[in-house]
Amino acid sequence: MQSRPQLVSMLVAALLLPACTERAAFRGIDVGGVDWGGDFTLVSHEGRPVSTAAFRGKVLILFFGYTHCPDICGPTLAKLAALRKQLGPEAEWVQILFVTVDPERDTPDQLRRFVPRFDPGFIGLTGMPEQIAAVARDYKVGYTGNPAEPAAPPTIAHSGSIFVKDRGGSLRLLFRNETPVADMAHDVRLLLKSERR
């Protein structure tokens, strides 16, 4: 028979272990506590203002790209569509936003032709160039090139990170472009288990 102190120690360890395990269990990059990546309002592909604050209670996933992107944007959106499928019914509590870095060409009409092809629940966002630049700065997203200028290159170089906000609206995770869908689903499920703030 175990002594009382041993039982108490085992009980304390059992209580602490889940908290420690969950804290260290993210497979993406944990950026919890950063002072950037705040709320913003842009225009959706349906022509309506959309604020990220409206998605409190959901896990919010953001990707910055553009519809004429020749490489990572399409595959990344396809990967995020696969993520929603893998989440099954839990996908109802996940919202994915595609924020253009090419507002000159990516009008609401252009986004409407592009974004819902990957998943009808995705929302494409655009705005004035200065609005997009401000949001990109706040999320540490770099992009170069201006296709509206004839001398500019036909493509825009941009960051490929995927940003994940928790149900309370705080930026919590970064996924690299090559992060497997299974790892994304694992982390999103952890965030979905957290209490609403």
Q: Model segments located where?
A:
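N-terminal export leaders
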Residues: S3-V8, V12
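Bacterial signal peptide processing site
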Residues: T21-R23
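Hydrophobic beta-strand anchors of alpha/beta hydrolase catalytic cores
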Residues: I61-L62, I96, I162
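Short active-site neighborhood of thiol/selenol oxidoreductases, capturing the structured segment around
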Residues: A53-L80
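A short beta-strand-turn-helix
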Residues: F40-L60, R84-L87
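Thiol/disulfide oxidoreductase modules built on the thioredoxin-like
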Residues: Q131-D187
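Structural microenvironment flanking redox-active thiols in thiol-disulfide oxidoreductases
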Residues: P75-V135
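C-terminal motif of bacterial Sec signal peptides marking the signal peptidase cleavage site
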Residues: L16-A19
